[in-house]
Amino acid sequence: LEKNIQELGDYAAKLEIKLVVEALTPYESNFFTRANDLVELFRRVDNPYVVGMCDIVPPFVQHESIMAYFDKLGNKMDHMHIIDGENGSDTHLIPGEGNIPIKEMLYEMKRIGYDKTATLELVTNYINEPRFYAKRAIDNMRELMAEAGIV
């Protein structure tokens, strides 16, 4: 796997694009499931075009700090999947409809000056009517961002 990521990273460098590696839940993967796994990968694959991201459900499910990704990955922390979840489950819920403290996370992201990308991730429960759920997710996210003082 390390060799493959090195090769993909070298190719990404030639194209001047980033290869973004996502830690998944233990239900989805046994390779990269925590921030420390990504730190170890970046130690072994020293390539500025290989970066990491945080889908906030995996750390939440594993009782790992979401903000640890920012602390541990530093400038390699390049993207976020913002979604909500419930304790002990990897089910992805619309932001604001689960137990993840998203408003507080947004406040902390603002406080540390995170200025890279983030997307809302809608999967599983929302596949049949994505337009309905996307609108609700965007509306909820706008409200959470306003409460966190971002907009």
Where are these regions (language model features)?
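Gly/Pro-rich active-site loop or hairpin
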Residues: 28-35, 39, 58-115, 123-132
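Hydrophobic faces of well-ordered beta-strands that scaffold small-molecule active sites
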Residues: 19-21, 50-54, 78-82, 116-121
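C-terminal helical cap(s) of enzyme catalytic domains, especially alpha/beta-barrels
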Residues: 129-151
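Alpha-helical scaffolding segments of alpha/beta enzyme cores, especially the outer helices
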Residues: 3-10, 14, 36-40, 44, ...
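Active-site acidic/histidine proton-transfer and metal-coordination neighborhood
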Residues: 1-51, 63, 151
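Structural motif corresponding to the early beta-alpha repeats
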Residues: 2-6, 14, 110, 115, ...
